[in-house]
Amino acid sequence: MECASCAIKQLIYQYAHYLDGGDLAAVAGLFSRGKIIAAGGDGDTTTEGAEAVAALYASFTRLYPDDGTPHTLHLTGNIVVTVEDDGAAAGAQSSAVVFQAVDGFPLQPIIGVRYEDRFRKAPQGWYFTERRIDTRLVGDLSKHLLRSV
């Protein structure tokens, strides 16, 4: 029997690993049937589908030429998964703190976020239908982002 909570946590962790590895196509692939909602003071911004998510991350994320990564480490935790009674849908809440270090920029936390996720189950397994990103804490993002958010 599959552990739904385990499979969902794996997706949450994959997002962080792909992003830290600079694999923006893999990040986008997680949302081939889903959307990302960025919560903001001026209202929410929704990006739907792998192609749009790939373009979004490419427009914001600074990848360094030495290794093709953003030189970040996402620490994701406090994951709470709730599977619906029918076993075909689920939700999860989690938090992440992102650390970064580059030349001239010592290791430091640069942002803290809260994720509110929705998932569906298909014959191939679980997938994201929605990720809501709520930025809670902001540090120096100048070495991480290509433009301000």
Predicted features by range, described:
Residues D66-V149:
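A beta-strand edge to alpha-helix "cap/lid" segment located at domain peripheries
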Residues C3-I12, G40, E51, A58, ...:
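Binding-site signature for planar aromatic cofactors or substrates
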Residues M1-G21, A25-L30:
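Short, low-complexity N-terminal intrinsically disordered segments enriched in polar/charged residues
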